[in-house]
């Protein structure tokens, strides 16, 4: 099966910093992947995100933009741009809490993987090969339709402390705008 790794160049950011994103279902080696992160294995410097906590492409792309922008401007609050992506998803300023709520856990089965090309040797091909070798799960398209099947709306609302957001038809759009607003406003002075 072809790996649906998507490479995105975000507007307003240097084209030399493309972002590689892949989405997986039925991942069965999350404990291994998490341990690689915890041990600081540089080969596994990715943002490993529990996909059930991602509402839409816009939601995660907003967090990525914020993290990469902070990276470029020397404002990282975490170890690297990849951990900053996970931290940027959180509406709070507690790094450990953001990893508990949004990062990979030993029980994660739906995984969103993000890699920023911070060095020239990080290419679409190198990321695709590495993920294919180490992620034991089924790659699926990184699309709003897929994310809507995976997203746990009640967990997301709880993490962002959001209640009812209006009529059923309007609720999804309001939720997405609330999530993006929370990412934009966190840490603003």
From Swiss-Prot:
Q: Does the keyword Nucleus apply?
A: yes
Protein origin, superkingdom: Eukaryota
Q: Does the keyword Transcription regulation apply?
A: yes
Q: Which keywords does this chain's UniProt record carry?
A: Activator, Chromosome, Nucleus, Telomere, Transcription, Transcription regulation, tRNA processing
GO biological process assignments: tRNA threonylcarbamoyladenosine modification
What's a GO cellular component annotated to this UniProt protein? chromosome, telomeric region
Q: Name one Pfam family in it.
A: CGI-121
Q: Which residues form a coiled coil?
A: none
Location relative to the cell: Nucleus; Chromosome, Telomere
Chief subcellular location equals nucleus
What InterPro entries does the record point to?
Answer: CGI121/TPRKB, CGI121/TPRKB_sf
Database matches in PANTHER family: CGI-121 FAMILY MEMBER, EKC_KEOPS COMPLEX SUBUNIT TPRKB
Q: Spell out the family assignment given in the record's similarity comment.
A: Belongs to the CGI121/TPRKB family.
Q: How does it assemble?
A: Component of the EKC/KEOPS complex composed of at least bud32, cgi121, gon7, kae1 and pcc1; the whole complex dimerizes.
Known function: Component of the EKC/KEOPS complex that is required for the formation of a threonylcarbamoyl group on adenosine at position 37 (t(6)A37) in tRNAs that read codons beginning with adenine. The complex is probably involved in the transfer of the threonylcarbamoyl moiety of threonylcarbamoyl-AMP (TC-AMP) to the N6 group of A37. Cgi121 acts as an allosteric effector that regulates the t(6)A activity of the complex. The EKC/KEOPS complex also promotes both telomere uncapping and telomere elongation. The complex is required for efficient recruitment of transcriptional coactivators.
This protein's name: EKC/KEOPS complex subunit cgi121
Recall the taxonomic lineage recorded for the source organism.
Answer: Eukaryota, Fungi, Dikarya, Ascomycota, Pezizomycotina
The gene is cgi121
């Amino acid at each position: 099966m072809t790996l649906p790794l998507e490479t995105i160049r975000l507007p307003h950011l240097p084209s030399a910093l493309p972002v590689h994103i892949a989405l997986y279902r039925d991942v069965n080696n999350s404990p291994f992947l998490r341990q690689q992160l915890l041990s600081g294995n540089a080969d596994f410097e990715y943002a490993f995100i529990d996909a059930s906590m991602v509402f839409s492409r816009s939601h995660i792309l907003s967090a990525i933009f914020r993290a990469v922008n902070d990276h470029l401007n020397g404002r990282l609050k975490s170890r690297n741009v990849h951990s900053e992506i996970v931290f940027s998803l959180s509406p709070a300023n507690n790094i450990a809490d953001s990893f508990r709520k949004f990062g990979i856990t030993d029980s994660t089965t739906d995984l969103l993987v993000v890699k920023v090309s911070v060095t020239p040797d990080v290419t679409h091909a190198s990321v695709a090969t590495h993920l294919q070798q180490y992620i034991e799960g089924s790659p699926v398209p990184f699309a709003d339709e897929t994310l809507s099947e995976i997203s746990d709306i009640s967990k997301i609302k709880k993490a962002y402390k959001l209640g009812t957001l209006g009529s059923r038809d309007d609720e999804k759009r309001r939720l997405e705008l609330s999530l993006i607003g929370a990412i934009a406003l966190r840490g603003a002075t």
